[in-house]
Amino acid sequence: MGDILGLVAKRLGLGLVILLIISVIIFFMVELLPGDIAQAVLGQGATPENLAALRREMGLDQPAIVRYLTWLKGAVMLDFGNSIVTGASVSQTIGTRFANTLFLAAYAAAIAVPVSIILGVLVALARNSIFDRVANVVTLTSISSPEFFLGYILILYLAVKTGMFPAIASLREGMDFGELLYRTFLPALTLVLVVTAHMMRMTRATIINLLASPYIEMARLKGTPPWKVIVKHALPNAWAPIINVVALNLAYLITGVVLVEVVFVYPGIGQALVDAVSKRDFPVVQAACLIFAATFILLNLAADVGAILTNPRLRHPK
């Protein structure tokens, strides 16, 4: 147990260092963008006195390092200031949008994870068959297709031509859970098509590799039924790489959802980021980017911990 806690602590410490470095990059990349924030807020007709007063109010008259430390302190307390465009709290705005993104990611994961594992095992058992070749072509096509392309294809056939689902994933207060699932089905399906292909191929490769192991051959020679060979002998040793790839794809579901949210006009954090960039709402841009980075690092940490817990060789590296 001590070895596991030590490894987790090292991963956590490394993640915090990486997040700190990313926070520096995010802040100063925004600082380097052309234009004057005060001018953007007040407009071209603002007087020099009003511009100077707003710069003092926003702390723009202070050195960049001082402003970074102030912003970082607020970020640690989940206080990202106020939106330049709306004046609303960035934390509240981003919090609502992030909750919507988490729901969409969870919706897609609930479908993609079991489907990809089951299909990966079936394809591995039917290696080199027609089913395997068809699955290989379909997954490669899905992986190579951009998310926005898949999204527009689904909109064309499932929304425009058939009218089965709405083309825009609009949400409203008081919506019941069934309607919520219905309205967000197309963006969730778009994400499912992308991540299922990745996870299915990894599961297939892992199972095929394990089926060639000596202990699997021994189990077969003993007359163990094929399903029992998979469930009792192959899957327990396949969980480490499978859990790792699942966690990494969950990270993608949250951080790579921007294009999907834009295509379906879904009110998530990705859509908020795009809107903020177009309106030069820098506090929202900084907050959204930092949340994306923190989420990705956290899920990578979860992948590392899952791999450690399911692989004895990682638990006892010596």
Regions found by a protein language model. Give the residues of each.
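Alpha-helical transmembrane segments of integral membrane proteins
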Residues: 2-7, 16, 98-131, 147, ...
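Hydrophobic alpha-helical segments of integral membrane proteins
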Residues: 4, 12, 50, 54, ...
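Residue-level recognition of pore/gate-forming positions within transmembrane alpha-helices
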Residues: 15, 23, 45, 140, ...
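Juxtamembrane/transmembrane-helix interface segments of polytopic membrane transporters
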Residues: 22, 26-30, 151, 155-159, ...
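An internal, D/E-rich "acidic patch" concept
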Residues: 1-4, 61-117
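Hydrophobic alpha-helical transmembrane segments of membrane transport/permease proteins
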Residues: 18-69, 162-183
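Membrane-water interface segments at the C-terminal ends of transmembrane alpha-helices
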Residues: 25-32, 62, 70-73, 137-167, ...
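Charged, compositionally biased N-terminal leader segments and the immediate start
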Residues: 1-29
